[in-house]
Amino acid sequence: MIYTPAPEDARLPPVRINLLSDTQTQPSAAMREAMARAPVGDEQIGADPTVNALCARVADLLGKEAAVFMASGTICNIAATLAHCRAGDEILAHETSHVVSLEGCTHAALGGFQIHPLAGTAGQFSADTLRAALHRPDRHQARQSLVCVEQTTNLGGGTVWRTSALGDIAALASANGLATHMDGARLMNASVASSVSPRQIASGWDSVWIDFSKGLGAPLGAVLAGSNDFIDQVWLWKQRLGGSLRQAGICAAACLYALDHNVDRLADDHANARLLAAGLSQIGGVTAEPPETNLVYFDISDVALSNQEFVDAMRADGVLISILGGRLRACTHLDVTTAMIQEALEVIRNVVERDTAARIGRRAQV
Ligand SMILES: *Cc1c(COP(=O)(O)O)cnc(C)c1O
Protein backbone atom coordinates (compact mmCIF):
# COMPACT_ATOMS: atom_id res chain seq x y z
CA MET A 1 0.00 0.00 0.00
CA ILE A 2 2.93 2.31 0.74
CA TYR A 3 6.03 2.53 -1.43
CA THR A 4 8.85 5.03 -1.21
CA PRO A 5 11.84 4.90 -3.58
CA ALA A 6 15.36 5.22 -2.17
CA PRO A 7 16.08 8.96 -1.75
CA GLU A 8 19.82 8.39 -1.17
CA ASP A 9 21.15 5.83 -3.62
CA ALA A 10 24.72 6.17 -4.94
CA ARG A 11 23.80 4.26 -8.13
CA LEU A 12 21.12 6.82 -9.04
CA PRO A 13 21.37 10.50 -9.99
CA PRO A 14 20.74 12.91 -7.10
CA VAL A 15 17.15 13.91 -6.38
CA ARG A 16 16.35 17.19 -8.14
CA ILE A 17 12.67 17.47 -7.32
CA ASN A 18 11.27 16.04 -4.11
CA LEU A 19 7.51 15.54 -4.32
CA LEU A 20 7.55 12.66 -1.86
CA SER A 21 5.92 14.53 0.98
CA ASP A 22 5.63 17.92 2.64
CA THR A 23 7.73 16.36 5.41
CA GLN A 24 10.77 16.73 3.11
CA THR A 25 11.33 20.45 3.64
CA GLN A 26 14.69 21.74 4.86
CA PRO A 27 14.54 24.30 7.67
CA SER A 28 15.43 27.67 6.10
CA ALA A 29 18.39 29.79 7.24
CA ALA A 30 16.03 32.28 8.91
CA MET A 31 14.21 29.46 10.72
CA ARG A 32 17.53 28.05 11.94
CA GLU A 33 18.49 31.52 13.19
CA ALA A 34 15.23 31.77 15.15
CA MET A 35 16.00 28.35 16.64
CA ALA A 36 19.50 29.42 17.66
CA ARG A 37 18.19 32.55 19.40
CA ALA A 38 15.37 30.83 21.34
CA PRO A 39 15.33 31.11 25.15
CA VAL A 40 14.92 27.57 26.48
CA GLY A 41 14.31 25.65 29.71
CA ASP A 42 13.12 22.26 30.94
CA GLU A 43 9.92 21.47 29.04
CA GLN A 44 9.05 18.54 31.28
CA ILE A 45 8.44 20.84 34.26
CA GLY A 46 6.78 23.57 32.18
CA ALA A 47 9.85 25.79 32.29
CA ASP A 48 10.64 26.26 28.61
CA PRO A 49 9.49 29.80 27.74
CA THR A 50 9.51 29.21 23.96
CA VAL A 51 7.47 26.01 24.24
CA ASN A 52 5.06 27.79 26.57
CA ALA A 53 4.70 30.67 24.11
CA LEU A 54 4.02 28.23 21.26
CA CYS A 55 1.42 26.28 23.27
CA ALA A 56 -0.38 29.48 24.30
CA ARG A 57 -0.38 30.66 20.70
CA VAL A 58 -1.75 27.39 19.28
CA ALA A 59 -4.38 27.07 22.04
CA ASP A 60 -5.60 30.54 21.08
CA LEU A 61 -5.36 29.80 17.34
CA LEU A 62 -7.58 26.72 17.79
CA GLY A 63 -9.88 28.29 20.40
CA LYS A 64 -9.00 25.81 23.17
CA GLU A 65 -8.10 26.27 26.84
CA ALA A 66 -4.71 24.59 26.78
CA ALA A 67 -2.15 22.89 24.55
CA VAL A 68 0.91 20.68 24.78
CA PHE A 69 3.99 20.40 22.57
CA MET A 70 4.76 16.99 21.10
CA ALA A 71 7.62 15.61 19.02
CA SER A 72 5.30 14.43 16.24
CA GLY A 73 1.76 14.26 15.00
CA THR A 74 1.65 10.54 15.57
CA ILE A 75 2.24 10.97 19.30
CA CYS A 76 -0.56 13.57 19.36
CA ASN A 77 -2.97 10.96 17.98
CA ILE A 78 -1.64 8.30 20.36
CA ALA A 79 -1.74 10.43 23.53
CA ALA A 80 -5.13 11.90 22.60
CA THR A 81 -6.77 8.51 22.01
CA LEU A 82 -5.20 7.14 25.21
CA ALA A 83 -6.57 10.13 27.11
CA HIS A 84 -10.06 9.87 25.57
CA CYS A 85 -10.56 6.09 25.69
CA ARG A 86 -9.97 3.09 27.92
CA ALA A 87 -9.25 -0.53 26.98
CA GLY A 88 -12.21 -2.19 25.29
CA ASP A 89 -13.49 1.08 23.81
CA GLU A 90 -14.31 1.69 20.17
CA ILE A 91 -12.98 4.55 18.03
CA LEU A 92 -14.98 5.50 14.94
CA ALA A 93 -12.86 6.88 12.10
CA HIS A 94 -12.73 6.85 8.31
CA GLU A 95 -11.35 3.55 7.01
CA THR A 96 -8.45 5.29 5.23
CA SER A 97 -7.43 7.54 8.13
CA HIS A 98 -3.94 7.78 9.58
CA VAL A 99 -5.05 6.55 13.04
CA VAL A 100 -6.49 3.43 11.41
CA SER A 101 -3.83 2.50 8.89
CA LEU A 102 -0.55 4.34 9.36
CA GLU A 103 0.38 4.23 13.05
CA GLY A 104 1.50 0.65 13.50
CA CYS A 105 -1.86 -0.39 14.98
CA THR A 106 -1.27 1.72 18.10
CA HIS A 107 -4.92 1.54 19.06
CA ALA A 108 -4.55 -2.21 19.61
CA ALA A 109 -0.88 -2.32 20.63
CA LEU A 110 -1.04 0.38 23.29
CA GLY A 111 -4.67 1.14 23.97
CA GLY A 112 -6.66 -2.07 23.60
CA PHE A 113 -9.12 -0.13 21.47
CA GLN A 114 -11.24 -1.37 18.61
CA ILE A 115 -11.54 0.63 15.40
CA HIS A 116 -14.92 0.97 13.72
CA PRO A 117 -13.92 1.92 10.17
CA LEU A 118 -16.37 4.24 8.42
CA ALA A 119 -16.78 4.42 4.64
CA GLY A 120 -17.22 7.55 2.54
CA THR A 121 -15.69 9.28 -0.46
CA ALA A 122 -12.49 11.35 -0.31
CA GLY A 123 -11.59 10.29 3.23
CA GLN A 124 -14.76 11.79 4.67
CA PHE A 125 -17.89 10.21 6.13
CA SER A 126 -21.34 11.70 6.58
CA ALA A 127 -23.29 12.25 9.79
CA ASP A 128 -25.74 9.62 8.46
CA THR A 129 -22.95 7.06 8.16
CA LEU A 130 -21.87 7.84 11.71
CA ARG A 131 -25.46 7.65 12.97
CA ALA A 132 -25.89 4.22 11.40
CA ALA A 133 -22.70 3.00 13.12
CA LEU A 134 -23.71 4.13 16.62
CA HIS A 135 -25.40 1.80 19.08
CA ARG A 136 -26.93 2.25 22.51
CA PRO A 137 -24.77 1.29 25.51
CA ASP A 138 -24.93 -2.50 25.53
CA ARG A 139 -22.97 -5.06 27.53
CA HIS A 140 -22.41 -7.19 24.43
CA GLN A 141 -20.69 -4.49 22.40
CA ALA A 142 -17.69 -2.20 22.70
CA ARG A 143 -18.22 1.12 24.46
CA GLN A 144 -18.14 3.72 21.68
CA SER A 145 -16.09 6.57 23.07
CA LEU A 146 -14.45 8.59 20.30
CA VAL A 147 -15.01 9.91 16.78
CA CYS A 148 -11.95 10.98 14.75
CA VAL A 149 -11.66 13.02 11.57
CA GLU A 150 -8.67 14.12 9.52
CA GLN A 151 -8.37 17.70 8.29
CA THR A 152 -7.27 17.60 5.49
CA THR A 153 -7.78 13.97 4.56
CA ASN A 154 -4.49 12.39 3.58
CA LEU A 155 -5.38 9.19 1.71
CA GLY A 156 -8.66 10.87 0.82
CA GLY A 157 -6.76 13.19 -1.52
CA GLY A 158 -6.03 16.22 0.65
CA THR A 159 -9.70 17.20 0.66
CA VAL A 160 -11.06 19.79 3.08
CA TRP A 161 -13.90 18.96 5.47
CA ARG A 162 -16.56 21.68 5.31
CA THR A 163 -17.32 23.25 8.69
CA SER A 164 -21.01 22.36 8.35
CA ALA A 165 -20.13 18.64 8.02
CA LEU A 166 -17.72 18.88 10.94
CA GLY A 167 -20.39 20.62 13.01
CA ASP A 168 -22.98 17.93 12.23
CA ILE A 169 -20.59 15.15 13.20
CA ALA A 170 -19.41 16.81 16.41
CA ALA A 171 -23.02 17.52 17.44
CA LEU A 172 -24.10 13.93 16.76
CA ALA A 173 -21.09 12.54 18.64
CA SER A 174 -21.61 14.67 21.72
CA ALA A 175 -25.37 14.01 21.75
CA ASN A 176 -24.42 10.33 22.04
CA GLY A 177 -21.76 10.87 24.71
CA LEU A 178 -18.75 10.38 22.44
CA ALA A 179 -15.67 12.59 22.51
CA THR A 180 -14.36 14.12 19.27
CA HIS A 181 -10.78 14.28 18.01
CA MET A 182 -9.44 16.07 14.93
CA ASP A 183 -6.16 14.97 13.36
CA GLY A 184 -5.14 18.35 11.99
CA ALA A 185 -1.85 17.31 10.41
CA ARG A 186 -2.74 19.66 7.52
CA LEU A 187 -5.39 21.79 9.21
CA MET A 188 -3.53 24.96 8.21
CA ASN A 189 -3.71 23.86 4.56
CA ALA A 190 -7.46 23.41 5.02
CA SER A 191 -7.75 26.87 6.58
CA VAL A 192 -5.80 28.61 3.81
CA ALA A 193 -7.60 26.70 1.03
CA SER A 194 -11.09 27.39 2.40
CA SER A 195 -10.51 30.81 4.04
CA VAL A 196 -12.03 29.41 7.25
CA SER A 197 -10.09 30.24 10.42
CA PRO A 198 -8.41 27.41 12.35
CA ARG A 199 -10.61 28.34 15.32
CA GLN A 200 -13.78 27.86 13.26
CA ILE A 201 -12.53 24.55 11.88
CA ALA A 202 -11.76 23.29 15.40
CA SER A 203 -14.97 24.66 16.93
CA GLY A 204 -16.98 21.96 18.70
CA TRP A 205 -14.13 19.42 18.63
CA ASP A 206 -12.74 18.26 21.97
CA SER A 207 -9.15 17.79 20.85
CA VAL A 208 -7.31 19.10 17.82
CA TRP A 209 -3.65 19.20 16.82
CA ILE A 210 -1.58 20.77 14.08
CA ASP A 211 1.67 19.46 12.64
CA PHE A 212 4.67 21.73 12.10
CA SER A 213 6.80 19.20 10.23
CA LYS A 214 4.49 19.05 7.18
CA GLY A 215 3.71 22.06 5.02
CA LEU A 216 4.74 24.53 7.72
CA GLY A 217 8.36 23.52 7.19
CA ALA A 218 9.68 23.01 10.73
CA PRO A 219 12.07 20.11 11.40
CA LEU A 220 9.74 18.54 13.96
CA GLY A 221 6.92 19.30 16.35
CA ALA A 222 3.16 19.23 16.71
CA VAL A 223 0.85 20.89 19.21
CA LEU A 224 -2.25 19.20 20.65
CA ALA A 225 -4.98 21.42 22.11
CA GLY A 226 -8.10 20.85 24.20
CA SER A 227 -9.64 21.62 27.58
CA ASN A 228 -7.46 22.05 30.68
CA ASP A 229 -8.64 18.67 32.03
CA PHE A 230 -7.95 16.91 28.75
CA ILE A 231 -4.45 18.38 28.44
CA ASP A 232 -3.72 17.22 32.03
CA GLN A 233 -4.63 13.69 30.95
CA VAL A 234 -2.49 14.03 27.83
CA TRP A 235 0.49 15.13 29.95
CA LEU A 236 0.21 11.90 31.95
CA TRP A 237 0.38 9.89 28.70
CA LYS A 238 3.15 12.06 27.31
CA GLN A 239 5.19 11.24 30.39
CA ARG A 240 4.31 7.53 30.24
CA LEU A 241 5.26 7.33 26.56
CA GLY A 242 8.60 9.01 27.17
CA GLY A 243 7.44 12.06 25.26
CA SER A 244 8.31 14.70 27.87
CA LEU A 245 11.18 16.85 26.62
CA ARG A 246 13.95 19.12 27.93
CA GLN A 247 15.18 22.24 26.05
CA ALA A 248 12.55 21.74 23.37
CA GLY A 249 12.24 25.49 22.81
CA ILE A 250 14.90 25.12 20.11
CA CYS A 251 12.26 23.25 18.10
CA ALA A 252 9.29 25.28 19.30
CA ALA A 253 11.07 28.38 17.97
CA ALA A 254 10.98 26.83 14.49
CA CYS A 255 7.23 26.28 14.93
CA LEU A 256 6.66 29.89 16.01
CA TYR A 257 8.70 31.02 13.01
CA ALA A 258 6.53 28.80 10.80
CA LEU A 259 3.32 30.38 12.15
CA ASP A 260 4.71 33.83 11.36
CA HIS A 261 6.12 33.09 7.91
CA ASN A 262 4.87 29.85 6.39
CA VAL A 263 1.08 29.86 6.71
CA ASP A 264 -0.16 32.26 4.00
CA ARG A 265 2.32 30.85 1.51
CA LEU A 266 0.55 27.45 1.67
CA ALA A 267 -1.63 28.98 -1.06
CA ASP A 268 1.44 28.74 -3.36
CA ASP A 269 1.68 24.99 -2.67
CA HIS A 270 -2.01 24.61 -3.51
CA ALA A 271 -1.53 26.54 -6.77
CA ASN A 272 1.45 24.35 -7.67
CA ALA A 273 -0.58 21.23 -6.90
CA ARG A 274 -3.39 22.44 -9.22
CA LEU A 275 -0.82 23.17 -11.93
CA LEU A 276 0.64 19.68 -11.56
CA ALA A 277 -2.77 17.99 -11.70
CA ALA A 278 -3.80 20.04 -14.75
CA GLY A 279 -0.55 19.08 -16.51
CA LEU A 280 -0.96 15.41 -15.59
CA SER A 281 -4.47 15.35 -17.04
CA GLN A 282 -3.04 16.39 -20.39
CA ILE A 283 -0.74 13.36 -20.56
CA GLY A 284 -2.34 10.37 -22.29
CA GLY A 285 -2.93 7.43 -19.97
CA VAL A 286 -2.71 9.57 -16.83
CA THR A 287 -5.69 10.74 -14.77
CA ALA A 288 -5.61 13.19 -11.87
CA GLU A 289 -8.37 14.83 -9.88
CA PRO A 290 -8.08 18.60 -9.33
CA PRO A 291 -6.61 18.89 -5.81
CA GLU A 292 -8.15 21.06 -3.06
CA THR A 293 -4.83 21.46 -1.25
CA ASN A 294 -1.23 20.22 -1.70
CA LEU A 295 -1.68 16.48 -2.31
CA VAL A 296 -1.99 15.25 -5.89
CA TYR A 297 -3.12 11.65 -6.26
CA PHE A 298 -3.05 10.26 -9.78
CA ASP A 299 -3.46 7.04 -11.69
CA ILE A 300 -1.66 5.62 -14.70
CA SER A 301 -4.12 2.85 -15.42
CA ASP A 302 -3.70 3.18 -19.19
CA VAL A 303 0.09 2.82 -18.98
CA ALA A 304 1.76 -0.60 -19.03
CA LEU A 305 4.11 0.24 -16.14
CA SER A 306 3.06 -0.79 -12.65
CA ASN A 307 2.87 2.00 -10.06
CA GLN A 308 6.12 0.81 -8.54
CA GLU A 309 7.93 0.70 -11.90
CA PHE A 310 6.61 4.20 -12.59
CA VAL A 311 7.89 5.54 -9.24
CA ASP A 312 11.29 3.92 -9.86
CA ALA A 313 11.45 5.36 -13.40
CA MET A 314 10.73 8.83 -11.98
CA ARG A 315 13.42 8.30 -9.32
CA ALA A 316 15.92 7.32 -12.02
CA ASP A 317 15.22 10.76 -13.56
CA GLY A 318 15.74 12.52 -10.23
CA VAL A 319 12.09 13.05 -9.24
CA LEU A 320 10.68 11.58 -6.04
CA ILE A 321 7.04 10.61 -5.71
CA SER A 322 5.45 7.81 -3.69
CA ILE A 323 2.63 5.29 -3.59
CA LEU A 324 0.13 5.79 -0.81
CA GLY A 325 -3.08 3.85 -0.38
CA GLY A 326 -2.28 2.06 -3.64
CA ARG A 327 -2.23 5.31 -5.64
CA LEU A 328 0.56 7.54 -6.94
CA ARG A 329 1.01 10.66 -4.81
CA ALA A 330 2.93 13.84 -5.47
CA CYS A 331 3.02 16.45 -2.75
CA THR A 332 3.88 20.14 -3.08
CA HIS A 333 5.62 22.11 -0.30
CA LEU A 334 7.80 25.11 0.36
CA ASP A 335 10.90 23.64 -1.28
CA VAL A 336 9.02 23.03 -4.54
CA THR A 337 8.90 25.86 -7.09
CA THR A 338 6.58 26.31 -10.07
CA ALA A 339 9.58 25.69 -12.36
CA MET A 340 10.12 22.33 -10.62
CA ILE A 341 6.49 21.41 -11.31
CA GLN A 342 7.01 22.11 -15.02
CA GLU A 343 10.16 20.02 -14.96
CA ALA A 344 8.47 17.15 -13.10
CA LEU A 345 5.70 17.15 -15.73
CA GLU A 346 8.36 16.89 -18.42
CA VAL A 347 9.88 13.87 -16.66
CA ILE A 348 6.47 12.21 -16.32
CA ARG A 349 5.71 12.86 -19.98
CA ASN A 350 9.05 11.24 -20.95
CA VAL A 351 8.46 8.20 -18.75
CA VAL A 352 5.00 7.68 -20.24
CA GLU A 353 6.24 8.22 -23.81
CA ARG A 354 9.13 5.77 -23.33
CA ASP A 355 6.61 3.27 -21.99
CA THR A 356 4.29 3.76 -24.95
CA ALA A 357 7.19 3.48 -27.42
CA ALA A 358 8.38 0.27 -25.75
CA ARG A 359 4.90 -1.22 -25.98
CA ILE A 360 4.53 -0.31 -29.65
CA GLY A 361 8.00 -1.81 -30.24
CA ARG A 362 6.97 -5.03 -28.50
CA ARG A 363 3.78 -5.24 -30.53
CA ALA A 364 5.75 -4.67 -33.76
CA GLN A 365 8.02 -7.59 -32.92
CA VAL A 366 5.10 -9.99 -32.43
C1 LIG B 1 1.69 12.91 8.81
C2 LIG B 1 0.38 12.62 9.40
C3 LIG B 1 0.27 12.21 10.73
C4 LIG B 1 1.47 11.94 11.60
O1 LIG B 1 2.25 13.07 11.81
P1 LIG B 1 3.82 12.90 12.06
O2 LIG B 1 4.25 14.27 12.46
O3 LIG B 1 4.42 12.42 10.78
O4 LIG B 1 3.99 11.89 13.17
C5 LIG B 1 -0.99 12.00 11.23
N1 LIG B 1 -2.09 12.18 10.47
C6 LIG B 1 -2.02 12.58 9.19
C7 LIG B 1 -3.28 12.79 8.43
C8 LIG B 1 -0.79 12.80 8.61
O5 LIG B 1 -0.73 13.16 7.32
Regions found by a protein language model. Give the residues of each.
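Conserved PLP-enzyme active-site core in the AAT-like
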Residues: 2-336, 344-366
